[in-house]
Curated annotation (Swiss-Prot):
The keyword tRNA-binding does not apply. Keywords: Cytoplasm, DNA-binding, Transcription, Transcription regulation. It comes from the Bacteria. One of its GO terms (molecular function) is DNA binding. The keyword Cytoplasm applies. The gene is yebC. This is Probable transcriptional regulatory protein YebC.
Length: 246
């Protein structure tokens, strides 16, 4: 998730879940294989692969494992016959939710996603029901840094926006295809980001209260536990006050 003040509780909760290293690695490897199969094995010429490589390295995947996954995709590995599927729906409190999946069996995947929604008070929607609320962006995050220096370097490199939060954290937003190029330019200027990811950024937010927040988090947990689910995006916002009660 992009940002800190807006998304900190979600990001930190997800980071704790990512301790399930085996499942996370399996999902990243699946994305590496698929991205390489569809767009070739050169990350500099394949934005989707570059984003997957960045995510793999951020999760401490070894270069050897990463390169083997790319080689499988380029070589047309029989296990790489996956397709990207996007599901949309509404969760507790009217939250808009997008689920990005990689699957070789649509029927299995939609059944798992629908089950999660039904268990948590949400509804799986039709194509386009919430997609218009989100924009696909690259998000390069700094936990701290000099705002003017980062902003100047980022905008010069082609970034679309730079946002500074109350806690001093800074997010650089880019066209998703340009994220790798902008990140490289920032690093060349001596500015090493703490994370970089492709995300779906919502244009509106849905405030969660003490009743709806835990239901939303449970839904996200259930969706992320589905083997075919790669990413879950939502526009729910949980205030610090509500988060403290969870």
């Amino acid at each position: 998730m992009a940002g800190h003040s807006k998304w900190a509780n979600t990001r930190h909760r997800k980071a704790a879940q990512d301790a399930k290293r085996g499942k996370i690695f399996t999902k990243i490897i699946r994305e590496l294989v698929t991205a390489a199969k569809l767009g070739g094995g050169d990350p500099d010429a394949n934005p989707r692969l570059r984003a997957a490589v960045d995510k793999a390295l951020a999760n401490n995947m070894t270069r050897d494992t990463l390169n083997r996954a790319i080689a499988r995709g380029v070589g047309g590995d029989e296990d790489s016959n996956m397709e990207t599927i996007i599901y949309e729906g509404y969760g507790p409190g009217g939250t808009a939710i997008m689920i990005e999946c990689l699957s070789d069996n649509r029927n299995r995947t939609v059944a798992e996603v629908r089950h999660a929604f039904s268990k948590c008070g949400g509804n799986l929607g039709t194509d386009g029901s919430v997609a218009y609320l989100f924009s696909k962006k690259g998000v390069i995050s700094f936990e701290k840094g000099d705002e003017d220096t980062i902003m100047e370097a980022a905008l010069e490199a082609g970034a679309e926006d730079v946002v500074t939060y109350d806690d001093g954290a800074i997010d650089v937003y880019t066209a998703w295809e340009e994220m790798g190029k902008v990140r490289d330019a920032l690093e060349a200027a001596g500015l090493k980001a703490d994370s970089a990811e492709v995300s779906m950024i919502p244009s509106t937010k849905a405030d969660m209260d003490a009743e709806t927040a835990p239901k939303l988090l449970r839904l996200i947990d259930m969706l992320e536990d589905c083997d075919d689910v790669q990413e879950v995006y939502h526009n729910g916002e949980i205030s610090d006050e509500v988060a403290a009660t969870l």
